[in-house]
Amino acid sequence: MSLRQLLLRLSGYLGASGPPNRHWWYFRSLDTISSVGSWRGRSSRSPAHWNQVVSEAEKIVGYPASFMSLRCLLSDELSNVAMQVRKLVGTQHPLLTTARGFVHDSRHNLQLRGLVVLLISKAAGPSTRNSSSQNYDMVSGIYSCQRNLAEITELIHTALLVHRGIVNLSELQSSDGPLKDMKFGNKIAVLSGDFLLANACNGLALLQNTKVVELLASALMDLVQGIYQENSASTQGNPIPDDIRISTWKEQTFLSHCALLAKSCKAAMELAKHDAAVQDMAFQYGKHMAMSHKINSDLQPFIKDKASDSKTFNLNSAPVVLHQEFLGRDLWIKQIGEAQEKGRLNYTKLRETIKAGKGVTSAIDLCRYHGNKALEALESFPPSEARSALENIVFAVTRFS
């Protein structure tokens, strides 16, 4: 059986449908990206454009992103976990959605981080500090250790996605299904996420580079801290969001959504023995590209043609934070109160109120600002197909037509 056939069979094994649109204790805006493009063009927003950008990038690095962490995901240990995950089919536990994303999810592109690490590794090329004898290890312009780093980056990201799918049992409703299903799903989420993190740590040790280990360890610490802050700011059960400025939002977003990619890009340069200046430019690209990617995700509920695709949205997302900043705290709380109907928040009404303000357009400008900063960082790399692919990724997450 071919690898592609195996993936398709596993996809059917996990089922085709996802759980209903529902708010758990964690944020549902997990770096999703769809219907995006470049502000420099006038094409309509379409997932096909993003898929084309990713497909062309994969050809350049010679490594399909969808297979990035497949060796780990198809291991004997995780195969046993997959057998247990099958028992969740038919329930509403969010772990199922994440599991299906491992197999095929062109809309969310869970493997974006690893692909970017490979692209920036190829764009930078070998360092002059590397001896010619070390270059034999390169395939398609990328060292094997850099490919391993890309897989490790994906394992860490995937593990955090799995852990973020843990359901807060104290907030369950009768419509969520049996309590025993949610308890069982939580156990599997904890175990499988820990397994992926353990494999990532093992892979880091095998790289035998203490600076890289330190970078990725600090990225993991940032992720945990950022997710904790997000959960603390969650508006579940409380319609009044935190009073935060966009500067605070950016600090929190860097921790939870940007640090892993930024530090992985820097680590890839360290593995190739590039100097500090090149490492910093790689870090800046990863940081600003990830930031624009997150802002694009936050904007989707406000720019999608079909409002039914996003009935709810995060009240601590970039457009909402900017809307509150322009409006003032008191008027914002008043608008939330006016959108209340029978004790529940009418998101459709609140969305239209936010769209009428300056928050959405300001968020688009902020997304483009970080996109431009990412492009500026790329100017330090020599022109190449890999650099062009990195530029196209930025164009794709900053198009709003």
Swiss-Prot record:
Q: Which UniProt keywords apply?
A: Isoprene biosynthesis, Lipid metabolism, Mitochondrion, Transferase, Ubiquinone biosynthesis
Which coarse location class applies to the principal site listed for this UniProt protein? mitochondrion
From which domain of life does this come?
Eukaryota
Looking at the UniProt entry, the stretches that span the membrane are: none
Recorded hits in InterPro entries, A to Z, give: Isoprenoid_synthase_dom_sf, Polyprenyl_synt
User: Pfam families, per this entry?
Assistant: polyprenyl_synt
Q: What class of enzyme is it?
A: transferase
Q: Name one GO cellular component term.
A: polyprenyl diphosphate synthase complex
Which Gene Ontology terms cover its molecular function?
all-trans-decaprenyl-diphosphate synthase activity; prenyltransferase activity; protein heterodimerization activity
Q: Which GO terms describe its biological process?
A: cerebellum development; isoprenoid biosynthetic process; regulation of body fluid levels; ubiquinone biosynthetic process
Q: What is its EC number?
A: 2.5.1.91
> Which reaction(s) does its UniProt entry say it catalyses?
7 isopentenyl diphosphate + (2E,6E)-farnesyl diphosphate = all-trans-decaprenyl diphosphate + 7 diphosphate; 6 isopentenyl diphosphate + (2E,6E)-farnesyl diphosphate = all-trans-nonaprenyl diphosphate + 6 diphosphate
Which cysteines share a disulfide bond? none
Concerning its family, UniProt says: Belongs to the FPP/GGPP synthase family.
**What is the protein name given in its UniProt record?**
All trans-polyprenyl-diphosphate synthase PDSS2
* Protein source organism: Rattus norvegicus (Rat)
